[in-house]
């Protein structure tokens, strides 16, 4: 969520434009390595005995996650008149997100390098490791509960609070609710598609599905590193920060387009019978 602070400086003045930006940023949040790792694990766990739940794991996970985001956003918006975010919150939250994105990208690329060409790559996330037992969730409520647990982190809460403070200051409570809803909807779309995608891959056992996971691992790691690099540059250079703020909507759209292309490429690779080495 490194790009989210750019929302505050976005040149878009129309509420609809801000809602679109918030929705696209929600899609970006949905491709965090922790989200993908958790959804992957729960989908695989339920694929055999509960295939219907497996296909909807991403949907229920993101709904639980989104409830926390909505609660934080509305709570901050309702108290915005009596509380002002400290100056250190935005840079601290940004650097926390930058560090987490860079670390997770490095871990996932290392896993990609270690994995044999014909084997599936398992995405890594610190929360997925911390809540490893919870990832065996075998009911809709349990999956939503995991989404709630994953939302209880400084980067998620701080960015939600920042979005609320920004929206409340410039557009009011109704606008805050719209922005938060658009953000959560974008996240639901990506996480829901990810759960469906993993379920489809499980139905296609063999080298093709394994190669597809390698495609996604490289794509997600690249997005994480690129986002971290841009966020760090924006924090260190006012010129870069201004450019990124001016083009924040297009940057977010580009990220989502890359994710969509990698999903489609993964499905195409999974269908190909001939071996394709990506390492």
What role is predicted for each listed range?
Residues 32-35, 65, 102, 155, ...:
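Divalent metal-coordination and catalytic microenvironments
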Residues 15-26, 91-106, 175-186, 252-256:
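Alpha-helical transmembrane segments
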Residues 31-35, 109-120, 189-203:
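Membrane-water interface of transmembrane alpha-helices
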Residues 14-83, 160-176, 201-202:
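Juxtamembrane transmembrane-helix termini in multi-pass membrane transport proteins
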Residues 2-31, 54-60, 129-153, 174-183:
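Small-residue-enriched transmembrane helix starts and helix-helix packing motifs
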Residues 6-7, 81-87, 235-246:
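Membrane-interface helix termini and inter-helical loops of multi-pass transporters
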Residues 53-129:
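Membrane helix-loop-helix hairpins that form the core translocation module of multi-pass transporters
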Residues 168-174, 190-279:
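C-terminal regulatory/interaction regions
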């Amino acid at each position: 969520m490194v790009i989210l602070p750019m929302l505050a400086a976005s040149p878009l003045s129309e509420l609809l434009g801000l809602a679109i930006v918030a929705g696209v940023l929600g899609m970006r949040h949905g491709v965090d390595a922790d989200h993908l790792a958790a959804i992957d694990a729960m989908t695989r766990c339920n694929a055999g005995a509960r295939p219907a739940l497996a296909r909807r794991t991403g949907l229920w996970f993101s709904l639980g996650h989104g409830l926390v985001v909505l609660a934080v956003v509305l709570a901050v918006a309702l108290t915005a008149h009596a509380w002002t975010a400290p100056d250190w919150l935005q840079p601290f939250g940004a650097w926390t997100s930058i560090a987490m994105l860079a670390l997770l990208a490095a871990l996932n690329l290392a896993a990609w390098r270690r994995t044999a060409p014909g084997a599936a790559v398992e995405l890594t996330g610190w929360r997925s490791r911390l809540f490893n037992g919870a990832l065996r969730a075998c009911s809709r409520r349990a999956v939503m509960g995991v989404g709630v647990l994953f939302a209880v982190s400084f980067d998620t809460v701080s960015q939600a609070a920042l979005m609320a403070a920004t929206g409340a200051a410039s557009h009011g409570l109704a606008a805050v609710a719209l922005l938060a809803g658009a953000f959560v909807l974008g996240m639901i779309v990506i996480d829901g598609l990810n759960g469906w995608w993993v379920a489809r891959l499980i139905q296609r056992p063999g080298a093709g599905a394994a190669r597809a996971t390698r495609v996604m691992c490289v794509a997600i790691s690249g997005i994480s590193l690129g986002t971290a690099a841009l966020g760090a540059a924006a924090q260190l250079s006012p010129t870069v920060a201004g450019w990124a703020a001016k083009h924040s909507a297009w940057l977010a759209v580009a990220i989502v387009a890359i994710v969509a292309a990698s999903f489609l490429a993964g499905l195409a690779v999974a269908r190909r019978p001939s071996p394709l080495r990506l390492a």
